């Protein structure tokens, strides 16, 4: 079974969010179970540096200008690089400039990515032809449209990592990307008068997947669908929308072998976790008190992630003698809000603006509770890392958070099902309820330890996810 993943990021070479983590793990897990999985990405500078040894597979001119398709390997996985310097030779973020302005030629940059993805199912590489073309998020959404235009030479899968980002462009660009005008239609690319690359992926793919079962249900409702509820409800009714949970890359995220921390630990030997907590407190200049309940948050600072809810409820942590460490960057007003908290409560709250991979590992290893109070969360990875490290997730009941964390109610604790703390309402009161629940359990050490055991025994490996996709591919190939 030959599967091509069409994507725009690959951990650890280039990452702006969770998509990169998925692409840095799923194809590798698929290879381990016998799927011949490859990737195709733009040859961004960071990607090219990480995969320096390549051979030319094809060279051509199309709507995007002169393009060279290269092939190399990364950790044993075949990777095609689309070498078009006039489109991709830009350092930093792949989607916008240093002032956060989207590149004006994004419509063409990501149309080319999708076009090449489709062509690799029709013989662009003479030696390898995809049977399944699996596109990820709006950047690759046009792949299924090009496949449709070519007579569907391969089966197509489209994965929604975040429906909020829709890849919308003015319709006159359609003439510049090699697709016919008749595809700009409500039954096609059109979304409220614009082209939507994400809608193209949904409409033209044989099947679409969301990155958790609950998110697959949520996006059929107006609250989560961003205007696409009609199409998504139709796909669900047709059996063309399913949810498959993301996994944890245990080569990178495992407390017993984590390359970023010095003090490793495992379920039956937890001394390392206590050492990581002291190191984390020292890093953030917080009192090195092992008895203080330490909350951590590693996130983009946006309303989606519930950062404003945390700003409104952080005093609840302070009042009960807890500590809070935050790592992230994002909206200026939210950065200002958490910086104010750190200045107001220097003994309890500390912040680092930016992103630091090594620090994120120390925070998840050293924290007691990891906060994920998102308004919506397609899957979420940090709560899965928290479970793996015995850092109990405090989450809102939405998307993948609802699928992966079981609340520490008295019934769930008694039944040995509890793995964290769950609240329902996306408001300050809801998060305060979750914070209070964490403190209540913290004061019962034996119960706290039993919940940690449950959490660390959960299996959210990529092998499980890979088998889920394999079953999906099998169904498509035998239709």
Swiss-Prot record:
Annotated pathway: Glycan biosynthesis; glycogen biosynthesis
GO molecular function terms attached to this record: alpha-1,4-glucan glucosyltransferase (ADP-glucose donor) activity; alpha-1,4-glucan glucosyltransferase (UDP-glucose donor) activity
Catalytic reaction annotation: [(1->4)-alpha-D-glucosyl](n) + ADP-alpha-D-glucose = [(1->4)-alpha-D-glucosyl](n+1) + ADP + H(+)
Biological process per Gene Ontology, one example term: glycogen biosynthetic process
One GO term describing the cellular component: cytosol
Biological function: Synthesizes alpha-1,4-glucan chains using ADP-glucose.
Family: Belongs to the glycosyltransferase 1 family. Bacterial/plant glycogen synthase subfamily.
Protein name (Swiss-Prot/TrEMBL): Glycogen synthase
Organism the protein comes from: Histophilus somni (strain 129Pt) (Haemophilus somnus)
Lineage start: Bacteria, Pseudomonadati, Pseudomonadota, Gammaproteobacteria, Pasteurellales
């Amino acid at each position: 079974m030959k599967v091509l993943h069409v994507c725009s990021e690959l951990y650890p070479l280039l990452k702006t969010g969770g998509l990169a983590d998925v692409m840095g793990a799923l194809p590798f897990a698929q290879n381990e179970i016998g799927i011949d999985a490859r990737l195709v990405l733009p040859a961004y500078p960071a990607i090219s540096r990480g995969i320096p040894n390549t051979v030319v597979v094809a060279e051509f001119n199309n709507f995007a200008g002169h393009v060279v398709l290269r092939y190399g390997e990364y950790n044993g996985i075949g990777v095609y690089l689309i070498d078009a310097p006039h489109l991709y030779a830009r350092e930093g973020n792949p989607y916008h400039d240093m002032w956060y302005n989207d590149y004006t030629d994004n419509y063409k940059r990501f149309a080319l990515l999708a076009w090449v993805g489709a062509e690799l199912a029709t013989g662009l590489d003479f030696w390898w032809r995809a049977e399944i073309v699996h596109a990820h998020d709006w950047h690759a959404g046009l792949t299924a449209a090009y496949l449709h235009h070519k007579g569907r030479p391969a089966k197509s899968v489209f994965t929604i990592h975040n429906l909020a980002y829709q890849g919308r462009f003015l319709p006159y660009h359609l003439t510049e990307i090699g697709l016919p005008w008749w595809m700009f239609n409500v039954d096609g690319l059109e979304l409220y008068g614009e082209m939507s690359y994400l809608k193209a992926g949904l409409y033209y793919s044989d099947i679409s997947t969301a990155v958790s079962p609950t998110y697959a249900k949520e996006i059929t409702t107006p609250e989560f669908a961003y205007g696409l509820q009609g199409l998504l409800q139709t796909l669900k009714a047709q059996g063309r929308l399913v949810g498959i949970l993301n996994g944890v890359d245990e080569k990178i995220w495992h407390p017993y072998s984590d390359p970023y921390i010095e003090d490793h630990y495992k379920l039956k030997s937890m001394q390392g976790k206590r050492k990581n907590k002291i190191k984390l407190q020292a890093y953030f200049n917080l009192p090195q008190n092992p008895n203080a309940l330490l909350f951590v948050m590693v996130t983009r600072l946006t309303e989606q992630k519930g950062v404003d809810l945390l700003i409104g409820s952080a005093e609840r942590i302070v009042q009960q003698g807890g500590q809070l460490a935050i790592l992230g960057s994002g909206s200026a007003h939210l950065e200002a809000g958490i910086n104010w908290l750190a200045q107001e409560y220097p003994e309890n709250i500390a912040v680092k603006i930016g992103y630091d991979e090594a620090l994120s590992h120390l925070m998840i290893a050293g924290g007691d509770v990891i906060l994920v109070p998102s308004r919506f969360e397609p899957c979420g990875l940090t709560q899965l890392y928290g479970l793996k490290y015995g850092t109990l997730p405090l989450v809102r009941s939405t998307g993948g958070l609802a699928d992966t964390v079981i609340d520490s109610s008295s019934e769930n604790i008694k039944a040995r099902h509890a793995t964290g703390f769950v609240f329902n309402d996306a408001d300050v009161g809801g998060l305060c309820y979750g914070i209070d629940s964490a403190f209540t359990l913290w004061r019962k050490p034996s119960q706290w330890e039993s919940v940690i055991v449950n959490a660390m025994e959960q299996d959210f490996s990529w092998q499980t996810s890979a088998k889920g996709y394999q079953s999906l591919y099998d169904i498509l190939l035998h239709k």
